[in-house]
Amino acid sequence: LTAADIASGQRYLAMAGNTVEQIKDMTGPAAKLASILGQPFGGKGGVADLMTNIMSMYVIPSQQATKVTDDLYTAVTNANMSLTDLAQAITYAGADMANAGYDLRQTAAAIGVLGDMGIQGSSAGTALANMIRYLQLSLADQKKKGFSALTSLGLSPQDFFDAEGNLIRLDKVYRKFGEALM
């Protein structure tokens, strides 16, 4: 990475409203991710820009930038998608996933599964957001067709929530549907 690329990336970190201290926290991990993935650090769509968008969506503090880059790296290198695909999908699905109680790592993993099926970028984000929204609506309103579909499969809303009232992990949601359909 060049000094100009680092400066450009830090400009995007600043434009996102980060303080000097937050920019310091985020520069190293984001630059390392950019270097490892061979992507630009600065500029629109650079790693710094994508990271600030993702961290803002999940309200992740700058001190956790290394964890964020680890999660992004793991998702991108274990699925058929680029960092740009992942960030674009998170733009579409992140708010719904966060509201449903799923963190960045869980969201990235779900997007990775879709990426492996050739559903990438905004298409993956839209599909995931719709799935979560429809699942939540089906579980919340007994008058909806989705609720009837769940009960016809022998499933109830309680099957999809943990003891604290949060939606269970997506792999468990998929498993419940898979078992019900067999």
Report residues per predicted region.
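Soluble extramembrane regions of membrane proteins in the secretory/endomembrane system
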Residues: E164-G165, R169-K172, K176
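Amphipathic alpha-helical coiled-coil/leucine-zipper-like oligomerization segments
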Residues: A30, L72, Y174-F177
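Active-site substrate-binding loop specific to GH73 endo-beta-N-acetylglucosaminidase modules
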Residues: F147-S152
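A short, structural motif
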Residues: L1-K67, T74-L86, M97-R105, M117-G125, ...
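Conserved catalytic-loop aspartate of Hanks-type protein kinases
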Residues: L128
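Extended, hydrophobic alpha-helical segments in both membrane/secreted and soluble proteins
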Residues: Q106-A110
